[in-house]
Amino acid sequence: MTKPHDFKTKAIIVRKTKCGEADRILSLLTPDLGLIQGFAKSVRKTTSKLSGHLELLCYSEVSLARGKAIDTITGSQTIQSFLNIRNSLQLSAMAFYACELAYHFSPEEAANPALFQLLLSTLEELDNGSQPELCLKYFEINLLASSGYKPELRECANCHKKLQATINYYSPESGGVICPNCRNTQIGMPVSVNTVKVLRYIQENSFSSICRLKINREILSELELAIRANIRFVLEKEPKALFWLDSLRLADL
């Protein structure tokens, strides 16, 4: 979608970078333009009228003027600020992690409405307090799918035979779950029958449906190890927000 000289767009602020003494460069995830960068002049000054509308996690309607190197933000109005998330360290860490992933999985100026809606829905569900751990798993699995990395969960990702109800192996390098026979030639971590079932259910159902799931800590741990390995494989690095999220869990905050 071609941008006019002056334009408005709904956007989620997924990243902010200091620039000069009082300015910022903001990364905005939009439904129609994909990931775009915006220059926010003097937004770090206490007198700035825009600062409260351009914070990380804000869902806002943003006005921009097209520039040669970068667009300039000329106005912004908050649509949703997710106050419950901001008032909780744990939820904030989860939301920042989701925003970081959305940033890394979004090529600049390539529209991905499904990814935008996925992030917005995830922030709304986290703000509502609806099973935050499952909410994050739902986001991660569907993020992979909407970005072209949907893991194979019903047949072996290597030999393509139907998976049997036994211990199988999750292999990001192979593109999903592999069978015990292929484990001899491929790298993979063990996943139980129930973990694979939960992965399938999350991948194939709405968030309102997965909220009804009752998952024990062992399955949740297997899910986390598998999905994190997949994300790390795609990004070729560990998301920075994970360190904060894990430290809060260890401190039980």
Curated annotation (Swiss-Prot):
Domain of life of the source: Bacteria
Record Gene3D superfamilies: Nucleic acid-binding proteins, Recombination protein O, C-terminal domain
Keyword Signal: no
Record bears the keyword DNA damage: yes
GO biological process: DNA recombination; double-strand break repair
Cellular component aspect of the GO annotation: bacterial nucleoid
Ranges annotated as spanning the membrane: none
Keywords: DNA damage, DNA recombination, DNA repair
Homology family: Belongs to the RecO family.
Function: Involved in DNA repair and RecF pathway recombination.
PANTHER family: DNA REPAIR PROTEIN RECO
UniProt protein name: DNA repair protein RecO
Lineage, broadest ranks: Bacteria, Bacillati, Chloroflexota, Dehalococcoidia, Dehalococcoidales
Gene responsible for this protein: recO
